[in-house]
């Protein structure tokens, strides 16, 4: 690969990064994407001077970005000899033994999972990190990290008390949920909360009922827990497809007020009808995305003995936070708190203290109101570009959520389309891999968290231009 082509690809990928990010981070993401997706191992890069000129940055900025990629072992350098993309390790004289993984692990790894690419145009599930009030967050962090707060460096038992009280009040304001503080369990995010439910409330071989299409992360957690998964297609206009002869169901896992990945409002009536048909021992509702007015779509009842609610702050704030909560029936609060302590151990009290103060100060409410208005406008821009494309059956109505879903006509190969778009640096998820075998729906799931303003308008137009010929071909 010649020098000019490498420089051209660098500049092209750099231009696709969100302009709100620092120049160093944009360079890191551009080079990381090129190394992972496009360049072979052992490719010698142009000189630092040439790269800095191509990016239009100071050499020190480039050097910092390159140092980060060296730490990630994506680049290697020799003193005075240049910089190369890292070559694959040389094969050993004896072929390595294949990894001996459990059947559960193999099933998880064979299905859809977390993407290796967590930034870029339309990447699903990532909130707007650049606009988050990180300055206020850092100030709060500094204010709680003082010698008299040394206990915040220790283990926690069931979570930081003030954070549980803050969450209780937040749920009352935003979700019309009135629960006791003792019913709240602090978790390390949605996956951790779902895993705790799976371990505490079901045995290996028990059945969990899920909606189709489903959230891939929850399906992987249940698979890893050794549960039998029964996926039931759900359509907004018709409800759930009920099994003719339902067997015993330990858990019914349902999305909360806003369906993921379809990105449409759910129906408490549909969920109630499903639960009446299946009679699950417990109902776990995942309040993945929501706004202040859609709480009537929740089935959750804080006074019920079989309803649990899973929530997370990662989608509201930033993914690296990894803090969430469970609201559980009163009789389960003690046992599940103890089980969490035994299985996962608890800590991160500093993060919990900062989040509690962030909520008490009204900053989380203000952030949610602001960013949800913004997401609604962004979704409208994307919706307008997609709704008139050939082979498009429907586009989820603009909402204040991060995600948007476009459904294609039957027969369109959404997996191939997603792969083709990836080559154009457009990061989307195909819908069909998270549908049941009996659910023929195909489409794409995309996000609006990483793009805004003119960049969003430009990339939405580019997405349309790339999609149109692919859909005409049926790909």
Question: What residues fall within each predicted segment?
Answer:
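Short helix-loop capping/hinge motifs at secondary-structure junctions, enriched
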Residues: 330-335, 364-365, 411
């Amino acid at each position: 690969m010649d020098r000019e082509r490498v420089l051209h690809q660098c500049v092209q990928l750099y231009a696709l990064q969100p302009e709100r990010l620092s120049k160093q981070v944009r360079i890191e993401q551009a080079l990381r994407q090129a190394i992972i997706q496009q360049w072979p191992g052992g490719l010698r890069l142009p000189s630092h001077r040439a790269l800095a000129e191509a990016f239009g940055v100071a050499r020190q900025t480039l050097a910092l970005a390159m140092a980060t990629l060296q730490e990630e072992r994506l680049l290697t350098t020799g003193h005075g000899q240049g910089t190369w993309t890292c070559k694959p390790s040389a094969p050993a004289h004896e072929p390595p033994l294949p990894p001996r993984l459990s059947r559960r692990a193999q099933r998880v790894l064979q299905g859809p999972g977390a993407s290796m690419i967590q930034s870029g145009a339309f990447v699903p599930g990532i909130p707007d990190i650049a606009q988050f009030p990180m300055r206020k967050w850092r100030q709060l962090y500094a204010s709680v990290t003082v010698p008299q707060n040394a206990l915040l460096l220790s283990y926690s038992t069931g979570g930081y008390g003030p954070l549980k009280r803050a969450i209780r009040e937040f749920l009352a304001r935003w979700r019309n949920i009135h629960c006791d503080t003792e019913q709240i369990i602090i978790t390390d995010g949605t996956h951790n909360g779902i895993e705790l439910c799976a371990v505490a409330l079901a045995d290996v071989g028990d059945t969990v009922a899920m909606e189709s299409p489903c959230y891939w992360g929850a399906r992987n957690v249940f698979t890893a827990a050794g549960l039998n998964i029964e996926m039931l297609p759900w359509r907004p206009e018709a409800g759930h497809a009920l099994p003719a002869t339902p067997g015993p169901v330990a858990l019914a896992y349902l999305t909360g007020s806003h369906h993921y990945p379809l990105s449409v409002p759910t129906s408490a009536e549909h969920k109630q009808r499903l639960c009446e048909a299946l009679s699950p021992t417990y109902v776990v509702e995942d309040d993945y995305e929501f706004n202040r007015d859609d709480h009537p779509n929740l089935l959750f009842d804080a006074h019920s003995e079989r309803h649990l609610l899973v929530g997370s702050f990662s989608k509201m704030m930033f993914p690296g936070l990894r803090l969430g909560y469970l609201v559980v029936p009163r009789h389960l609060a003690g046992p599940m708190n103890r089980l969490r302590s035994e299985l996962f151990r608890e800590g991160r009290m500093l993060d919990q203290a900062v989040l509690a103060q962030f909520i008490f100060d009204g900053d989380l409410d203000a952030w949610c109101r602001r960013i949800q208005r913004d997401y609604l406008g962004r979704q409208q821009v994307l919706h307008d570009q997609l709704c008139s494309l050939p082979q498009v059956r429907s586009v989820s109505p603009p909402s204040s959520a991060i995600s948007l879903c476009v459904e294609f006509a039957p027969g369109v190969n959404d997996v191939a389309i997603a792969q083709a778009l990836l080559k154009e640096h457009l990061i989307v998820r195909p819908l069909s891999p998270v549908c049941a075998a009996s659910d023929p729906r195909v489409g794409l799931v995309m996000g609006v968290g990483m793009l805004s303003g003119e960049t969003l308008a430009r990339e939405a137009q580019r997405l349309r231009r790339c999609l149109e010929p692919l859909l005409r071909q049926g790909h």
